[in-house]
Amino acid sequence: MNKEKRDAEMEEQSARMLEEEQQEEQRADKKIAVIVARQGEALPSEFLMSLRLMEQPAGFTMELVEVEGRAGLAAAYGQAMEASTAKYKIYIDERVRILDPGLFARIVRLFEKCADLGLVGISGTKILSPDGIAFHSTRRIGSLRLAEEARTVSWGRVLGEAEDVLAVDGFLMATQVDLPWREDLFHGAAFFDAAQCLEFRRRGLRSAVLGQEEPLVEFLGESFPADEAGRRAFLAEYATEALPLVSILMPTHERPEFFKLALESALAQTYRHIEIIVSDNSEDDRTEELMKAYAADERINYTHDAGLSAMQNWLQPLERARGEYFSYLFDDDLYAPEKIERMADVLSMEDGIAFVTSHRCAIDEEGNIVADLAIDPLPVEETSRIPGELAIYGLLEKQANFIGEYTTVLLPRSARETVREVLTEEPRSALLDVECWMRLLEHGDLLYIVDTLSYFRKHDGQSSNDPAVHIACARAWARLLRERAERESGMRRKKMFEQADLIEMMLRARGR
């Protein structure tokens, strides 16, 4: 009898505990925690005043969770998250004054409608800049009132009730799901916010910026500087998720000494999300032996097929490329360390760019910079966006490739078909690069960076030293001038035909 009584009491106790847990969960579902990391002895009065004016959603309770923040915001927010049972948590910078009293109610309503929405903010970025700093992006949306400067910063209009972003800013971050904050990586006041958004993304949850006609908050201080240690930690952990993949295409043929230098320049890129696709059609195994030292590097994809023609060797990496952007690196050329980062930044942040190029230097076999009249002087005095049509005329007028070779440029994935088309056409042009640039520039502008971001090596083994190649190039220029002249009118048409006639006359005079 006693055993039956004990069993009944245990069942009753378990039922009470379950009921209490369910009641607690229900209370948590109707609870909002406002979490703030205090940097001084007390919270700013402006912050507290704006909090007192907030409208409390019907049926909800609200609590203020205040924690010490000087050890880092990720650690502080993690501590506060564990201390609160509230389903809805709103993490706010203490230097923020809320301007919309109904903001919390809006956030809760949005969460209740969108189960897959993990995190909401008042500003953010759709694409990160290659350096990982959200405020360097030109794809930002939302707005902020700056109290100190008495002005509003409007980055971009938010479409609809809310718009998805890659990362929201840490001024205000609201969640309906608890995930650990990366206090193991971030010990200051930067990068923790973008990192948290990417942690939500890893779990299939979206981040979004609230729609707004006017700023929802006012910022009363200055931004925290982006610490270098935090930036490096952020890129090491999230670059492959946050940044577009860039494919570096490296055809090589029996030049292992130069190739090794080229490969090392690709591996030294400051941009953190690259793949390097090497196609080797050497008839010997020197390059293959060299590549064994790089076997552990997951960024490199190497194949060796001596049966490939020179053009097939160019095409193989193009077909295997997975990147949003791509660039060739020929086995005797070099990249500057920041080439991909600088160029990917432009392509990801500006609309209407066909491709991006830069100044390049000529170097000799030893790597010494040498003069080259085809490269200097610069076509523009400062980094510039050149209208596509103007760039085409610049090429034809001077019959000089100021844009550069395939190593020099960075192209969007959409350019792959044009590159493939130019490389496979018969008869093959002697100006494969110029032909490609002119076709691409029919559909967009050229971004020219005046800094030197690549190096074109001049040496005895190049086909460009062959006089027959020079003659073929001259004929190709004459053909391009005539083809373009057919589409023009007036003086421009006349001048192009005259230039083509002059080239052909000079070739005839030399018996070519």
List each language-model region with its residue ranges.
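A conserved acidic beta->alpha catalytic loop
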Residues: 38-52, 56-58, 68-70, 97, ...
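Conserved nucleotide-sugar donor-binding catalytic segment
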Residues: 174-175, 179-188, 377-470
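A conserved hydrophobic helix/loop-capping motif in glycosyltransferases and polysaccharide synthases
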Residues: 30-42, 246-258, 262, 269-270, ...
